[in-house]
Regions:
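Basic, flexible Lys/Arg- and Gly-enriched helix-loop patches that mediate nucleic-acid binding at interfaces
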Residues: 1-131
Length: 131
């Protein structure tokens, strides 16, 4: 127990927050051009050194973890740890089995970068597709 001026303090070594990130916020701790996910938190949490574990694009919504625990964040994010991640996407245009095959081989990006192989499960395919 820790007390200051007779008042008990609650002390936690680490804090984890599960945030349903809305569109329009950057997955960053600070940015001079726009609002960040930390702006969505109460003031007391904003002062705890929290940072996003991963990244969702500004126009994307979904679950984002925030923490001040670097060790576990590293375990979740490091490509060497091979932690599976799952995303739900809605795209304009038809998804095909060729798209699934390209994901399975590893996508080739501009600049020569090749992504790790991934599974693409097509839920619906049409003018708008979901995977």
């Amino acid at each position: 127990m820790i007390a200051v001026n007779g008042e008990l303090l609650n002390w936690r070594r680490y804090t984890w927050v599960m945030l349903n990130k809305p569109a329009g916020y950057l997955s960053a701790t600070e940015d001079g051009r726009g609002a960040t996910v930390l702006d969505l938190l109460p003031q007391d949490l904003q002062r705890q050194g929290l940072f996003p574990v991963g990244r969702l694009d500004k126009d994307t919504e979904g679950l984002l973890l925030l923490t001040n625990e670097g060790g576990l964040a590293h375990e979740l994010l490091s490509p060497k740890k091979h932690v599976d991640k799952e995303y739900y996407v809605r795209v304009t245009g038809r998804l095909t089995e060729a798209d699934s095959a390209a994901f399975a081989e590893g996508l080739h990006l501009d600049g020569g970068l090749i992504c790790q192989p991934a599974e693409l499960r097509i839920l619906t395919s049409g003018e708008e597709s979901e995977a």
